[in-house]
């Protein structure tokens, strides 16, 4: 690579195992981003496997070193099968795995991105499927606005036309944006772009609070959706491989978990190097059945203990209430239970 501006694509995931479709998609994402800059930039595509504290059985039942090896085979496959331009480089990045070794916890996206300097962050694209982007803009995940305005998002649509229609990706995401929840998450610590918008449209802190509580003057906030959309770049649908489905990795794991002696689907979905590596080491055999109930993350354990303690307190309270009711018949039977509310 020559001494040109570098664009970074950050692709975090399980990659357990990585498939041919993952390789094809990565190649298409990298070449598309390069073309958006007239191929006058360097592009580094980083495959970033999650560490073993990520709460999924197919992460816990395969060693981190095995997933790193399989990704290295995938990079070799990409470089061998496709005409990779000299300005594009594919990298297997063990940043999150090293983070897990230090903290014994999974990493958030924002924590992972600390791999880059502040200057480099201006040139980072986070590779996300439409499903992940929708969950973010609906406010299901924390720190969405901070993330969207620290880096850019390259979004690829894995939905079928039957589900959302033809050429509806951008419209579908736009209509999914939940401004109330996104603003509420930030607690007035908004990105600079939002602060400038509020100042330009003379929207005070009270105006924002009224919008959050009752959607008052909703039309005045509509422009924020356009600011969010401006942070998204969309991979053209024809560049998303037909074989790329959210269940592709699951299909490989199911074949290995249940029908280990039948290798046809494994050969079709993975590269020769990965297929041989998996079968030689006997990876994934009975993976889900062995590991589905095991938690590793200390934060997950903490949450689990909290839920357990809460259940114990609830049971004790219920028994106590039952005794009280049996002793005192004057207490009204119509007393309603406390209403339970949950926010995702």
Language model features by range: what are they?
Residues 1-299, 343-344:
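Nucleotidyltransferase catalytic core that binds NTPs
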């Amino acid at each position: 690579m020559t001494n040109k501006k570098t664009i970074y694509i950050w692709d975090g995931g399980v990659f357990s195992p990585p498939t041919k479709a993952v390789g094809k998609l990565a190649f298409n994402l990298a070449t598309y981003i390069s073309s958006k800059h007239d191929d006058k930039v360097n592009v580094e595509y980083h495959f970033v496997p999650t560490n073993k504290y990520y709460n999924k059985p197919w992460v816990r039942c395969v060693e981190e070193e095995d997933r790193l090896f399989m990704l290295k085979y995938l990079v070799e496959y990409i470089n061998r099968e496709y005409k990779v331009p000299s300005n594009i480089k594919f990298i297997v990045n063990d940043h999150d795995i090293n983070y897990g070794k230090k903290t014994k916890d999974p990493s958030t996206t924002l924590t992972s991105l600390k791999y880059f300097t502040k200057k480099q962050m201006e040139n980072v694209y986070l590779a996300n499927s439409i499903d992940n982007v929708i969950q973010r803009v609906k406010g299901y995940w924390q720190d969405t606005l901070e993330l969207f305005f620290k880096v850019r998002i390259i979004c690829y649509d894995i939905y079928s036309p039957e589900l959302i229609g033809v050429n509806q990706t951008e419209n579908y995401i736009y209509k999914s944006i939940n401004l109330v929840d996104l603003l509420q998450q930030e607690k007035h610590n908004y990105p600079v772009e939002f602060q400038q918008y509020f100042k330009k449209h003379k929207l005070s802190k009270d105006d924002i609070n009224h919008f959050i509580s009752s959607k008052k003057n909703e039309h005045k906030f509509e422009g924020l959706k356009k600011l969010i959309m401006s942070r998204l770049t969309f991979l053209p649908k024809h560049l998303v491989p037909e074989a790329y489905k959210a269940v592709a990795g699951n299909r490989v794991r199911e074949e290995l978990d249940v029908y280990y002696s039948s290798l046809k689907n494994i050969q079709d979905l993975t590269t020769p190097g990965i297929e041989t590596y998996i079968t030689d080491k006997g990876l994934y055999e009975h993976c889900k059945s062995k590991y589905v109930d095991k938690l590793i993350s200390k934060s997950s354990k903490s949450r689990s203990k909290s839920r357990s303690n809460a259940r114990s307190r609830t049971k004790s309270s219920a028994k106590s209430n039952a005794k009280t009711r049996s002793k005192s018949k004057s207490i009204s039977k119509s007393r309603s239970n406390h209403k339970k509310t949950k926010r995702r």
